[in-house]
């Protein structure tokens, strides 16, 4: 039985889904349905845990309230002597997705990222091809009149001006300048190494998610837009090799929804899982699970990217706490740094660091990640059950260059904190997982004296930064590993697109929120112009 008919059914109300729901429903003749498994987050009822933009760890202290419950993954690659335990992976399950729960840093990446996409077969996705969509999405409070920035988009972006930095932050900048890193001011228009006030998606001190920016009250009242939250897509409906709709569990009812086109925006773990359950993926894997093959696309679930990370923390001394309490609150948390490890001269700017001190938590921190990784992982289905999670292995540090980059990053941090401006605080730096920054780990200086212990610690404790991407990548039709074309259309079937971080050929040198906003804008434009 067919319950409802739409032109576009969007599966996943995260960052990308919010964009597409807005842009496609802007045309009154388009009947659009957005389906989200998690809760709604309307402007007048945003949970306080996710509203505070200056305390971005709060959602992670709320258990699985805003995340897919009990979703576990493997982070580190297999290695002799290293025990791998499944770890909880916080993937947003609420309107706005990752933009509602992750860090609020707004980073585009580097032009070379998108030129690389073009070289890998994503025609039209080079820097000049994506820049207009970065501009379209943003309302930059500091650089809105700059030709590289926008001043009229749905997402506000701002920074804490250096005039309002805390004394501790100023001391950190002095250490960085002594190490040869200049203030580049705008990380999204200057692409060399240096430090800067990070750009945030904030309105005042409030988080500004994609749902808040693209699904405000003026959009929600559109009669041609339907929003179903707390609803679970069970499967895609097919006729031959055509995708004709979705089966949805809504409350206690299972509904069959017909669509002219289905667009997957469920994220880099859930979107490929839906493809695989539909019979789109590596034929051998599908046969092994008894799933009829609709389209043999070996790249589905492969090419899984993530930024490897580690953290360093130290309890604040009395003087450090006092100095961290000055200036505007935002400046106490983070000072952004783009740096080069030197591991591979062909890929400079391969590290991204934050240095800060928070008088509320009583901790100084220096967290960083491999900004241009070389390791990739994969995901596979365990079974065909729509309620089962896929088996996910990020395979971090499988490429030895990434291990070298983490080591180099730790040595850079040691070098920065040894400068007189920071050394005066007498901070005892200890290792900590980025996913749960807390004191109590081994002292950094001790580990740096023992190469074997350092490597063992990194392989055991390496984290990610919730930047999963690449599992249904764009590419040319003759590329067996490509899953979608330049407009997000899935090869081998009709009526189906993917339009989230899954389609990234490589992970950008950036947090993935802004790139995901950009790509959703670009795919929406392609749909509306039928490119």
Swiss-Prot record:
Signal peptide: none annotated. It catalyses: 5-hydroxymethylfurfural + 3 O2 + 2 H2O = 2,5-dicarboxyfuran + 3 H2O2 + 2 H(+); benzylthiol + O2 = benzothialdehyde + H2O2. InterPro entries: FAD/NAD-bd_sf, GMC_OxRdtase, GMC_OxRdtase_N, GMC_OxRtase_C. GO terms for molecular function: FAD binding; oxidoreductase activity, acting on a sulfur group of donors, oxygen as acceptor; oxidoreductase activity, acting on the CH-OH group of donors, oxygen as acceptor. Belongs to the GMC oxidoreductase family. Involved in the degradation and detoxification of 5-(hydroxymethyl)furfural (HMF) by mediating its oxidation to furan-2,5-dicarboxylate (FDCA), a biobased platform chemical for the production of polymers. Active with a wide range of aromatic and aliphatic primary alcohols and aldehydes: acts on alcohol groups and requires the spontaneous hydration of aldehyde groups for their oxidation. To a lesser extent, is also able to catalyze the oxidation of thiols that are structurally similar to its alcohol substrates, yielding the corresponding thiocarbonyls. PANTHER family: CHOLINE DEHYDROGENASE, MITOCHONDRIAL (PTHR11552:SF147), GLUCOSE-METHANOL-CHOLINE GMC OXIDOREDUCTASE (PTHR11552). This is 5-(hydroxymethyl)furfural oxidase.
